[in-house]
Amino acid sequence: MPGLFIHNGKFHQEHDAVISPDNRSFRYGDGVFETIRFHKHQMPLWNYHQQRLFGALDYLKFNVPKLLTADYLHNLILALIKKNDLTNARVRITMYRGEGGLTDKNPLQPGFVIQTWPIAKEALSLNVNGLRLGIFREGRKAIDHYSHLKTNNFLVYIQAALEAREQKWNDALVLNSENRIADSAIANIYWVKDNQIFTPPLSEAPIQGVMRRFLLEQLPIHEHPLTIEALEQADEVFLTNAVRGIQWVAFVGDTPYPTQITAATLYKDHIAPLFS
């Protein structure tokens, strides 16, 4: 049976056409999104997700209706999960500014879509085999006031993910406009050197990941720019995101990272308890 999704508070069948050709997210990528892990009737990092979502809407000057609140979205997600009969799921909220052109003077009414997909419980476990990554070199992510947002215009990340698929990498690292590493196509990056954990600061253009925020609040992680040379000299490398938790990296290009001690410890002590 096809799954259901929600558009502006109403349930629809999976293949229902509800988005106008004038939708500004379709035309210009004018919107933001959240990807959330649902596990055993809860979303453990929901507060971080809703803060990031509504913070982005405010930052991008969306005209958000008073009824469109975090509690309203939370209840819709739970209702959709129930209707789709899911226990473990990936949830996506997509917000768009409305319909119209770039120069329209009429007020724009934001809209939203909520989707869910089943996900295996094992997907949150620490990976047995280390990831093999490459560096996407055909594009750069700008360092600006918007670079930390999860916007719907994800061109550099799209191309990086395509490169990873073509090269048979598990993921691709994205460079910023200073030729330093910002993050990966789908995750934040960390490296370990001399028993200290580092991650690029938001001023280096990574996405402001919720798992990143969680770990930064739990642990003495140093925020520091990451050059390709520093990455090659790291003792350990790992990635995090809200859906997969933490994954250790075995190779970036031809550079090996044979240890997963830090990633395994973080998984055991901090990430696994979130979803127990």
Enumerate the language-model features and the residues they cover.
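Helix-start/capping segments and mature chain N-termini
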Residues: M1-A79, G101-S276
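Ordered, amphipathic secondary-structure segments that act as subunit-interaction surfaces
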Residues: I77, K83-M95
